[in-house]
Structures are given as structure tokens and as C-alpha cells.
Amino acid sequence: MPTSRPRGIHQGAAAEARAAAHLESLGREIVRRNYRIPGGEIDLVSREPGGTLVFTEVRQRRQARYGSALDSVTPRKLALMHRAALEYLTRECGRDDLPCRLEVLTIEGEADTGELRLLAVEG
């Protein structure tokens, strides 16, 4: 008997796939998807042609009823992103002083057709 996955999981996977394709169109190489540590996750880790690692949180909202996709990125989520990025650098790269940055990629509307925005995370 086939099992069905909740719509949110399908939407999340579709949003992350579209985000990865967009980052690749910018010349980046996707080096990791869904990097998890206890209490945190980075949706996409990519490398720019110049070598900078970019840690991307993907957020998608089909409807604005509960706020925008960007509104769903809380200070707590940003702190967890920082922690996960530092863990990635030390564990996967062996050092924490590599050029890197955090960003949020939002999709407003359906995952495959909604408006896409890429925003740098300050700090």
C-alpha cells in the first residue's frame, strides 16, 4: 500500500529544488542539501565561483494569510542557521575562517511559479 506524504513536504522539496536550480543559474555549485545538526538545519550549501560558501534558508508561502515567507524567518531561526553554518565549517571543512555568508531565498506563491527573492542575512 503506497504511503502519501503530506502536502507541506512535497511543497518544501519542490521549493528547495527550485531554489537549488536558481542558485546554479547564478553560477554556484550546490555542495550540500539539508545539512542537519541537533536543533538546526541548512537547506542548501553552495559555493560561488570565487570560493565563498553560501548557506541558504529556503522559505515558501503559498498564501500571505499568515505573513510572508520572509516573516517566517525568526531571530531564533537565524541563530540556528549561524550555529549550523559554523558546525558545517568546522566539521566538513576543518576550519571556521573560510569566506562565507548566510542568505534567505523566499518564494511567494506556488513553489514552481511563485515570486523568488534572494536576501542577504546581516551579521
Curated annotation (Swiss-Prot):
Cystines in this chain: none
Pfam family, one: UPF0102
GO molecular function (one): nucleic acid binding
SUPFAM superfamilies: Restriction endonuclease-like
Family: Belongs to the UPF0102 family.
HAMAP family: UPF0102 (MF_00048)
Name under which the protein is recorded: UPF0102 protein DR_2282
Organism of origin: Deinococcus radiodurans (strain ATCC 13939 / DSM 20539 / JCM 16871 / CCUG 27074 / LMG 4051 / NBRC 15346 / NCIMB 9279 / VKM B-1422 / R1)
Lineage of producing organism: Bacteria, Thermotogati, Deinococcota, Deinococci, Deinococcales
